[in-house]
């Protein structure tokens, strides 16, 4: 689709772009679709539904097929969320939770094109095989960092204890009676 992508910084006054973020710039000439001419075209495009929630809610399925959570689980959820137990329609809440769980299960079962590629960037609660970060790797990573003068970063300019009322040898001084003797 794109020939190449590169990360670049857009510089303006003071070395920062107007929103302080990095921008992606395409060096290729990719065409996605017709260019929008005005805000009405954008609103029309965004208001057109691509898919309906009703497809995945299972409204046509009978309520007997749904497996509602137990009444004890619903009461526990109500207590944990701080909602009142008194006057709560437990049966209605069970059916709503069953429909929501059914919807979530159907979303998880939707086939995704290029699933091998998307698994690397999966944001679901999936265990990832990451390498453990230890103290030596952290120090090694810090040693390779350099300040960017274009962004106004100056090496050694920040002192953590600079605004502290009392400090000694670049450490904060905490007195025992600090919170006890407050007025």
Curated annotation (Swiss-Prot):
Signal peptide: none annotated. GO terms for cellular component: glutamyl-tRNA(Gln) amidotransferase complex; mitochondrial inner membrane; mitochondrion. The keyword Mitochondrion applies. The keyword ATP-binding applies. It holds the Pfam family GatF. Subunit of the heterotrimeric GatFAB amidotransferase (AdT) complex, composed of A (HER2), B (PET112) and F (YGR102C) subunits. Allows the formation of correctly charged Gln-tRNA(Gln) through the transamidation of misacylated Glu-tRNA(Gln) in the mitochondria. The reaction takes place in the presence of glutamine and ATP through an activated gamma-phospho-Glu-tRNA(Gln). Required for proper protein synthesis within the mitochondrion. This is Glutamyl-tRNA(Gln) amidotransferase subunit F, mitochondrial. It comes from Saccharomyces cerevisiae (strain ATCC 204508 / S288c) (Baker's yeast).
């Amino acid at each position: 689709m794109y020939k190449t992508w590169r990360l670049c910084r857009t510089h303006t006054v003071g070395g920062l772009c107007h929103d302080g973020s990095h921008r992606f710039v395409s060096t290729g000439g990719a065409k996605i679709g017709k260019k929008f001419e005005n805000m009405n075209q954008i609103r029309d495009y965004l208001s057109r539904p691509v898919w309906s929630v009703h497809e995945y809610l299972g409204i046509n399925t009978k309520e007997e097929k749904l497996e509602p959570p137990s009444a004890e689980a619903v009461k526990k959820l109500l207590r944990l969320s701080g909602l009142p137990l008194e006057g709560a329609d437990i049966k209605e809440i069970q059916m709503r939770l069953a429909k929501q769980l059914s919807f979530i299960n159907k979303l998880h079962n939707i086939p995704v094109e290029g699933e091998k590629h998307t698994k690397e960037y999966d944001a679901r609660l999936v265990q990832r095989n990451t390498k453990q970060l230890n103290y030596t790797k952290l120090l090694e990573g810090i040693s390779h960092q350099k300040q960017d003068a274009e962004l106004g970063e100056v090496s050694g300019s920040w002192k953590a204890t600079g605004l502290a009322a009392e400090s000694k040898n670049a450490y904060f001084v905490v007195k025992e009676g600090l919170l006890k003797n407050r007025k």
